C-alpha cells in the first residue's frame, strides 16, 4: 500500500521506533524523525527520513505524529513540555503514542490534545524488534474513532 503524500513526524528512533519508522518510509510516507540521541536517527535517515532538530520541528508540518518512547516522564516532555509536539501540531492532525505508559499520563496528554483540537490515539504495541522490522507488530489502539480511521492505513 502506498502512503505517498502522508507527512509523518516520528519521535523516538531507538530499538523499536527506528524499524517502525522504516516501514512508513518504505511505504512512501514523507517522514521526519527526532531522537535526543542523534546516533539513533542515522538508520532512519539512511532509509530516507529527514533528521529533525527537535520534537517541535518534526511535528510542525506533520499530519500525523508518532512517538515510541521509554516512559511517562519522556511522554510528558515530548507531548506537553516546552517545544513539545502538541504545541507544534495543527488542529485536525493526529498524535499517536505507541509507548507503554501509565493511563494517568496518557490521560493528561489526551486532555491537552483534545483542548487543542488534535486527535490522540493510545497505541501501545506487542512484539519484538524482529517483528517491528517485518512490520508485523500487534497495535492496540484506542481513542477517537475518526482519528483511528485516518491512521489505519499507517498502522497496516
Functional labels for PLM-detected ranges:
Residues 41, 75, 130-133:
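A short acidic, helix-capping loop that chelates divalent metal ions and anchors anionic groups
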Residues 45-48, 81, 90-92, 133-136:
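Acidic, glycine-centered active-site loop in nucleotide-sugar glycosyltransferases
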Residues 55-119:
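Rossmann-fold NAD(P) dinucleotide-binding segment
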Amino acid at each position: 500500500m502506498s502512503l505517498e503524500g502522508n507527512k509523518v513526524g516520528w519521535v523516538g528512533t531507538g530499538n523499536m521506533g527506528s524499524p517502525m519508522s522504516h516501514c512508513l518510509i518504505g511505504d512512501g510516507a514523507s517522514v521526519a524523525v527526532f531522537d535526543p540521541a542523534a546516533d539513533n536517527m542515522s538508520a532512519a535517515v539512511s532509509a530516507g527520513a529527514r533528521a529533525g532538530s527537535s520534537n517541535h520541528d518534526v511535528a510542525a508540518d506533520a499530519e500525523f505524529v508518532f512517538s515510541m518512547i521509554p516512559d511517562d516522564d519522556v511522554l510528558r516532555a515530548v507531548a506537553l513540555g516546552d517545544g513539545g509536539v502538541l504545541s507544534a501540531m495543527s488542529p485536525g492532525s493526529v498524535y499517536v503514542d505507541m509507548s507503554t505508559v501509565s493511563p494517568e499520563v496518557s490521560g493528561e496528554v489526551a486532555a491537552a490534545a483534545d483542548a487543542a483540537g488534535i486527535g490522540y490515539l493510545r497505541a501501545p504495541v506487542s512484539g519484538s524488534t524482529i517483528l517491528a522490522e517485518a512490520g508485523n507488530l500487534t497495535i492496540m489502539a484506542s481513542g477517537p474513532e475518526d482519528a483511528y480511521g485516518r491512521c489505519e492505513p499507517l498502522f497496516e
